[in-house]
Amino acid sequence: MDFVQPDSIKNIHKLSIAPMMDCTDKHFRMIMRKISSEALLYTEMIVAQSLVYTNKKENFLDFNNEEHPISIQFGGDDPLILKDAARMAQDWGYDEINFNVGCPSPRVCSGNFGASLMKDPEKVAKCIEALKNNCKLPVTIKHRIGVDDDDSFSNLNNFVRHIANAGADRFTVHARKAILKGLNPKQNRTIPPLNYDIVKKLKKSNPELLI
């Protein structure tokens, strides 16, 4: 497969404000936009099912025009729901969709999304395809370098190839594995130490991908 990057993301954003639960709401994002006119802003993670079934979609989707460029981050595991969420994101005017398979929260993982989804590359690929096939926005993914004992480079590389073949436009890699048993989300942000070498190896093995 030839990987052709959309014009809208050929110029990689060198600065972004990461999606953070209970933090990156539209008020926080406006403050960040005052600091930088170039940074790519992210929403908090939005559970796709909650968005699709609510009658108050504006509570999830509203943002200020000054926030562009802005990426909406979805969590979920159902391609049928994600395709509807993708259409809504495009209709609402977002610049990009980001799919979260990096969150280690027990609440998130109990819903079979977030970091736990990395154990099922084929399902993640189907989710990416659903997003890509139902909008014209760039679709990117945030993931870890592994989950629990499933942290070999070969498994990571296989995961990325699956997702690349599904059409993902960019990979944002949190350079530590997620430990879903025994650590809380706060600990998962600092334990184990970051492993930038494996991310460098991943990029070297996939030079055609935006990583």
Task: Name these PLM-found stretches.
Residues 1-211:
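Flavin-dependent oxidoreductase catalytic cores
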